[in-house]
Amino acid sequence: MTIMMVAALLAGAGLAQAQWERIEKNMPLALAEELAAAAVADCQAKGYAVTATVVDRAGLVKVMHRADGAGPHTIDASRRKAYTSASARNNTTAMMENSQKNPGAQNLGQIDGFLMLGGGMPVRAGNEVIGAIGVGGAPAGHLDDQCAQAALDKVKDRLK
C-alpha cells in the first residue's frame, strides 16, 4: 500500500511539473544576422540606404546592420519597428492602418518604444513568433516592408 501511495504521489508531482513547463523556440544569432544582412542588401539593390534590426521574442536587439550612407535616425526607427512588431506579434503596417480606423487603437503609438510605421514584421517559426525584423530608411514604409519581406522570404524554408 505504501509503495502505491508513493508511486501515485511521484506520478502526480511529475504531472504538475509538466503543466508548468513551456518550451519556446528562439531565434539563433546566425538567423538574425542573415535576416538583417538580406534586408539591407535588398534595399541597397533598390537604391535605399537603410538600417535593419532584428530582435528576439522579448524585443531585445539580436543584431543591427546599418548600410553605408543610412541616416542616423534609421537606427532608432528600425529598432522601434522591430520592437513594436515583436511585442504585438503583428506587422507594423497593419497596426498603423488599424490605429487609423479604430479609435480604441489610436493610442498604441504612445506606448514607450512603439513606432507604428511600415517596416516591422514578426519572424515566425511555424505559428510561433520568435522575434521580429525592423527596417528603416527607405523613402516610405511600404518600401521598408518590401525589404523586410524579402529577407523573410530568403529564410522561410528554415522557419517551419
Tell me what each language-model feature is.
Residues M1-T2, I23:
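Long, non-catalytic terminal segments
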